[in-house]
Amino acid sequence: MEDGGVRRWVVDISKWNPSEDEFCSYLSVLPPHEHPTITRFIKCEDRKRALVSRLLQYSLVHEVFGIPFERIIINRTIEGKPYLQNTKSLAFPNFNFSASHHGDYVGIASEPVCLVGLDIISNSIPTQETALEFINNFSSYFTALEWKNITEAENSDEALAAFYRCWSLKEAFVKALGTGLGYGLQRLEFRHTNWTDISVYIDGEESRDWRFSLFEINDRHWASIAQGHPKTAVQSFRSTLLKADFEGEHHLDPFLLPDAGGFILQSVDQLVAVSKQEKLGRLAS
């Protein structure tokens, strides 16, 4: 279900293998200034992920606000948080979105009021080291409790899954906050009951300003969603929001808004269809 400015979309790129001409055709749907952010990648898979990520952003904004692709202006804060520049909507005062990719999937999530962060993970097994050796490289980013839960899992597969899920929650939080790579992930401690009823402790104190969800895309891919009160955004990102303080306005409480539930699977052709139809309409007129 989708409501208002809330969206949850994913694209499976594993079977999408466009020819060079087809790739250029899809790329042409986007404004020219976006092209270098995609073509700078050398590997084909990286280019595919970059292109689909941008297509998701533009297609989502177009669906929510009806803005033609060529008139959509997406800027970034100094920390790298993307935001929509050219709309101010009282219905969606803090419209924001977060894109992510890993493995076979590229996804996007949006919210009209509260902050949103998305992180997709592929539960892939490292090829040159064991799962436990791989996990140990990141021990400094977890609290003692988190590390205990990871390393005391029943087997290495379970340990790897616990590691990825916890890591993904941390990444989703940071992306929602808009802080960029400078935020110390070890400051965050996630507590949960079998990965439900997830709460976050920041510097040892539980925060009531956040809500978290984990979604299983398939047996190898998961998505983490972080939803935060807009007052928690870093200043550069907060300055792009219309409404950060909701005290005394319960009808605007971001956590009373309906959840979007699971993700809707989109195809690349679905993402570009509207833009192509608009171009054909202009040519015909």
Question: Residue locations for each model-derived region?
Answer:
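Core catalytic alpha/beta fold that binds nucleotide/phospho-ligands
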Residues: M1-S285
